[in-house]
Amino acid sequence: LSSAASDVYKRQMYNFRTDLALERRNLYRTANNIKNEIDGIETEEEKVGDDILTTRVKVLSKQGEEAINKPIGNYITIDIKNLKVANEDEMQKASEVVTKELKALIDKHVSSKDPVLVVGLGNLYVTPDALGPKVINEIDITRHLLEYMPEVLNEDTRSVSAVSPGVLGTTGIETQEILKGIVQNINPKLIIIIDALSSRSIERISSSIQIADTGIVPGAGVGNTRKELTKDSLGVPVIAIGIPTVVEAATIAADSLTMFIQKVQEQAKSNDFLNQLQEEDKYEMIKEVLSPNAVSYTHLRAHETLSDL
């Protein structure tokens, strides 16, 4: 690619939708040719074994906030290789890493006995959006037991309640409005929200976890923005946990083009090979990359991944 075309391509890449702060940070650096860290952003990496990488992104100032379009706060991304084929021991290790990071964030905001409300966002009947409601069914709820049968629990048991508020299309009520009513009645000191996210990378589908203490704007990653669920709107700290389950179609196309260009450049001695092609030849080569067989294969892989949720 020419320098001008490359710059345009980088700017377009930055516009791709993603809920992950780490990806927004990486895209911004690429689009603006930044080799060091972005002003107002702090990043720290920690590797656990060969398969788990934890990246902590801190947005420290308004400048950092504007750069990656994420509020000031802490964003932790846990990338787990081979999660979809992990054995029991590997799953346990991944669980311990997630637990450690989540506990550290919770401890920053509340004490060990403060009541917590867990919220599972999403539509149970739409596979890529069903993460939140499905997780809610697996959580140990204690609020009612502490109220009516406290003798069956340890003294240090935290009060945990949970709700899956559905989606606006089926309830006619904004999630923020539902949660405001719940908060006013049961007075949790912290809200933990679980939701499906969008990613810039196919490789992160069902293989990465983001934990953030800035709350969440439901639907923002796929252009269907709803009212924000944050400390400002709900009155209590909000921690959001999400796993990417969708990627934008343009992402798949862009990745295919990138792989195609890289492959051609590897096989050619220089970029002269590309420059010598007529526009019609370039079009035919690109069309070959995006042939129905290639697209069908990509769709199949994504479908298999989502089915593992």
Predicted regions and their residues:
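N-terminal amphipathic/basic leader segments beginning at the initiator methionine
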Residues: 10-69
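A structural signal for small-residue-enriched, beta-sheet-centric alpha/beta enzyme cores
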Residues: 163-164, 193-301, 307
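Glycine-rich phosphate/diphosphate-binding loop of Rossmann-like nucleotide-binding domains
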Residues: 123-158
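A structural-propensity feature for long, helix-poor, extended segments
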Residues: 155-182
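Short glycine-rich or small-residue beta-strand-to-loop segments that form or flank ligand, phosphate
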Residues: 77-81, 115-126, 162-166
